[in-house]
Amino acid sequence: YTLLINDLHQTAQEIQQKELHTVRGELALLVAVLINSFGVVLMLYSGAGISAISSVPFAFSEVFTRISLGTWTYLFQGVLVLSLMILRKRFVPQYLFSFVVGFVFGELLDVHEAWINLLPLTLPNRILYFAISYLLICIGIALSNRCGLPIIPTDLFPRELADITGAAYSNIKVSFDVICLAVTAGMTIFFLGHLDGLGIGTILAAFTMGKVIGAIGKWMDGRLRFVSVLTPKTAKPC
């Protein structure tokens, strides 16, 4: 009887896997990097404030203006990668590839900043830009968490920290975002004399994005199966 139940369960899983559409993890990661880098710059351009994951590099770029936002971004990501290795208490080669992905992400930020001013700035457009950027970032992070490849360190950090601590990803993500915002607020107020880069959109994103990413991820899990050269099985979702 037990063997019969196990066979039925395995058969059901195989049928479910066949019904899922297969997506290459490499393509998912490429899309995630492209739309996340654009989403971060578009959110800042909307005037609603920068996304929480890029708020700390933004603060450094405003205080130390000789270094671009993109450069500060991958420097910050390097710190996150090092922190994860310390928490793991071992060298993790995949984290180095994650840093390379983060470097590309940082360079794309500078590329988008160079042309974003061509977009018209009206109040309706600002609202539209924020909505689009919010959705793009959520989709990008959900894709990153499922691509089966090392991902951008700012996306990797909360996912790995959730795995290390055993806490829920959505809770870790919200806490990470809020801490980033607190650091940004402290730096800009102390060095610039005023709050810079943070707006109502930033606060809204920080407190809701983790939940929205989780919801989008569940939607993907019911329809898509991600495979890559590193992880032939579906990456563990968050």
Named regions from a protein language model:
Residues 1-238:
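Core subunits and conserved enzymes of cellular information-processing
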